Every structure is written in C-alpha cells, then in structure tokens.
Amino acid sequence: MNRVNVYIDGFNLYHGLRKMKKSDTDWQRFYWVDFVKLFDHFILFGQTLQKVYYFSAPDHDPFRAVRQDALFRANKLMNDDRFEVIYGKYYRKKLKCKLCTGRYVTHEEKRTDVNICAYMMSDCALNNVDAIMLVTADSDLVTPIELIRRDYPNKQIRLFFPPTTESRDLTNVMKAKKKEPIYLLNHKQKFINSLLPDVVSKDGTSLTIPQKWKDPYIISTPSNVIPNNLMSLYAKHFGDAQIIEFDHPNMQSFIKNLNQLTS
C-alpha cells in the first residue's frame, strides 16, 4: 500500500479561498473543512492517506487568530495524529502610503516554503512516504520537486493549485514528467463533501464553526477606525494592513486617487 502525505501551503490556500468567495460566497464555508477528508477524495487506487501537514503562521490579527485556532483544533480533534500544523512566523513591515502622508503596518509570512521543503525532503530521506500531494502555487517549491525526482525517483508527486491561484513554473515542472497540476477550483463538490459539522465534538471537547465563516455577511470591526467612506477603498488597496497614522490635507483628492488605483 502506497503511503501518501499531504503538504498544504496554508497561506496560499487561505488566500485562494478568500479571493474565490468574492465571486461565490459558498467558498467562505470551505474555510471550515476537514483537510484529511478533503484530500482523501483524491487518493488513488492502492494508496492510503497517512498524514496531512498544514503549514501556516499564527495570524497577527487577534480575531482571525481565534478562527484559525478553532479550525486547527477541530481538524486535530477529528483526525488525531493524521493532521499536524507546522508553524512559521509573521514579521511586521512598516510602509509609507504612496497616496497620502500616512504610514501603515503590514505583515509578511516567513518560513512556510522552507518548512514545506524540509518536511518533504526529510520524509523522502527517511522513507516515511511513497507519494506526495503538494498544495501550493509558490514557484519557490520548483527546486525541491526537482530534487525529489532526482534523488528519490520512486516517489510520486502530485501538485494541487489552491482556488484562484496557479504558477507557470510549477506547471512546467510537472509537465516535464507528463503530469498535470490539479486545480482545486474544479472540485467544489469535494469541498462540500468534506465540510466539518458546525459543532465538532469528541471526548468531551466541542468546537464550533466561527460565526463569520458561517454567515458571509458578518463584518468584523477593525481595531483602528478610519472614515467610513474610505473603509472599502482602503481595504481594496491595502488588504489586511493596519493603519497606524492617517493624516491627509485633501481628503477628496485622496479618495479620487484611491478610486483610480482600485478600479
């Protein structure tokens, strides 16, 4: 029986789902998914899903961090040792707004691609796996794929692109061995079939789906309040950035410039 491990680039997958829900709100429910069950649907004849590794970092936003923790704990509760989270780290970056005199803080995730590479190579070297499912669109992982093929030619590799994401470099490295990447966007029914129950209970422990994921119309209040008529525009441009200073002498000009940038 071929042993399969799944290596999920959590940052890629989360942001792929986040983009997808803008055109189809059903995809917001797929934040609350059983990862072992989801990728069990992709197992081939003669294979068995041994373990799912989810590579992520503790979210810098306290509200998202609580939701993230609930998801990880629910998956662990359902799957025991078949699910494991490998943590990287978010680093703060202070940037200057190009449209105003303000400054803002954003965060950059580090270590995920290195951690994925290290765990895949280690599992191959120790013969802990026969087949790899890699979930990412990060072209930095081209090299470890090539090295595994060179040094461990009997190890199978299948590539999965998160919704709304893809990589030409990764596609080419797969096609070099006459393999095609799998687009998770085309497998909505598998996500539906892999949803966790709204309340996950086991051995006296219960975890509930975060209300924001259950109801797509709930909006979180930001910790730093900016003028309401700018909130949606600012979010389009800066995403999850946290405003630390906001001072612009010509608000109408700022709105006009921001509209042009985000249209």
Predicted regions and their residues:
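Short, Lys/Arg-enriched, disordered terminal segments
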Residues: 1, 262-263
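Nuclease catalytic cores that cleave nucleic-acid phosphodiester bonds
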Residues: 84-262
